[in-house]
Amino acid sequence: MQSQKIRIRLKAFDYRLIDQSTQEIVDTAKRTGAQVRGPIPLPTRKEKYTVLISPHVNKDARDQYEIRTHKRLLDIVEPTEKTVDALMKLDLAAGVDVQISLG
């Protein structure tokens, strides 16, 4: 597994959860002897929704809502068998989406 690289992409609505999960992954990887590149903050996606408050008239009365999706990227270079086992056993927060790719 010395020539492989593990790329981890994290997505979450709450930046505190994603930063905490990223720190857990980095600590786990470094403890098992792997090199870590990152965390690299990727652009935050902002989705805005406008909703009419009034059911019939007053088109000017509106509410605006926003959902922010925060993203982070981690590269684990030269992972060992211990690194892969430790990452599989790692329990992350429920609000964090994790995508792992080997390359």
From Swiss-Prot:
Task: Write out the GO biological process terms.
Answer: translation
Kindly list the residue ranges recorded as spanning the membrane: none
Please tell me one Gene Ontology term that the record gives under cellular component. ribosome
Q: Which PROSITE patterns match?
A: RIBOSOMAL_S10
A Pfam match is Ribosomal_S10
Keywords assigned by UniProt, alphabetized = Ribonucleoprotein, Ribosomal protein
> SMART domains given for it?
Ribosomal_S10 (SM01403)
Q: Which GO terms describe its molecular function?
A: structural constituent of ribosome; tRNA binding
- Family label: Belongs to the universal ribosomal protein uS10 family.
Q: Which PANTHER family match?
A: 30S RIBOSOMAL PROTEIN S10 FAMILY MEMBER (PTHR11700)
- Which NCBIfam families does the record associate with it? PRK00596.1, rpsJ_bact
- HAMAP family per the record? Ribosomal_uS10
Quaternary structure, from the entry: Part of the 30S ribosomal subunit.
- Describe the function of this protein: Involved in the binding of tRNA to the ribosomes.
| Name under which the protein is recorded | Small ribosomal subunit protein uS10
Q: Which organism is it from?
A: Marinobacter nauticus (strain ATCC 700491 / DSM 11845 / VT8)
